[in-house]
Amino acid sequence: MYQAINPCPQSWYGSPQLEREIVCKMSGAPHYPNYYPVHPNALGGAWFDTSLNARSLTTTPSLTTCTPPSLAACTPPTSLGMVDSPPHINPPRRIGTLCFDFGSAKSPQRCECVASDRPSTTSNTAPDTYRLLITNSKTRKNNYGTCRLEPLTYGI
């Protein structure tokens, strides 16, 4: 189980448009736009926080919530399939899927945390530095970012 404790800056998404596509705006909780659900089988249901102010969350929300459980839940993911690892990572290694198809129906996005194939600019060369692959499942266009993930002790 992992949680991002060294989040990347907002520009890490590649473009504001991409960020708007994958952020859970439909949750009705605009004060918490940076929380994403994770696959419970991959990361134990821990939160992934992409905000500049990292938070330590000790709860285990359900897959269908993308804000803290006390706030409105958003629409459940439409797919639980994992996207392919980028071919330049050798060997391809899936760390865990962070979100699934939480974009709009017109431009769905899927995200996956995969092993980084080069040092992160945000986390030096730490072995717990991973890359987030964000794929538009219609255009198959990829964007990348890196965030450092740390193991947690709760929810085992």
From Swiss-Prot:
Protein name stated in the entry: Uncharacterized protein 003L
